[in-house]
Amino acid sequence: MRNKTLQDNTIVLGSCQDVAPLISGVDVVLTSPFYNTSTKSKIVPREKLGNANQRGRYDTIVDTYTREGYCDFMVDLFNKMHDGLQDNAVVLFNISYSTGNPDGYMFALSDIIRRTEYTLVDQIAWKKPVCIPDISTPNRLSRIVEPIYVFCKKGFEKTHYCNKPEISQGAASHRCYKPMYNFVEAMCGNKEKDEKKCPYNAATYSIELCVKLLRMYAPKNALVYDPFMGSGTTAVACKRMGLRWLGSEISENQVKWAEDRLKNAISPSIVEGKFDD
């Protein structure tokens, strides 16, 4: 049973390594961890750095682990989350690369599969409407697509949850399902109307992306955990859809920012993308 200090619909100020062992009954993990691709991250508030070339992505975490350290961090997190997830739960893991570190995250993914009780079952391409053009290299592409990796517990590859509609019934071997494609188009960052850009986090995904992913993988009244809650985007999407959420975040500034966003989040009764009754 979950530690009673962890209430639904809360964001805990603290490391995911400390919070993950306390979760239970989680249906979906939806997150975008730090990519470990920064070369200029500093433990100072981003808004206090006048020179854009000096700014790190985050106000607290230094995004420059060694390759081995980053792999160990992610393996440790997945292992600590294991008992708190439903057996049919999925982990939706948005992670990518940089020109300077194009393969580092591949080692982390490989170690998660080799060293934890999770395995990879799907990959989703997130197509952004725009991206920053790569004009500084002669042979690297501009990254307008980011991957989202879908993990489940080993042994549940055929039974993990997915909202894929059944279009014909019969014996299990003869059932047919409506196609659900591994390609999602969604805006990037907090660019919705009336939403301010978070000064403490320069690497956010969008509410639109979260809603589309949760409609694919979250059951009704699901409990969604984001170990890297950041500015609160996952929680805002959950509130809009009438889902429950838990989050962990080491930045006090971002926790306060997320809580303010949640106070103004739109009711699920007027949001396209909510679950039908």
Each language-model region and where it sits:
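Short, conserved SAM-binding/catalytic segment
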Residues: 1-7, 259-274
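Conserved phosphoryl-transfer catalytic core
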Residues: 50-60, 264-277
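Core catalytic lobe of class I
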Residues: 1-257
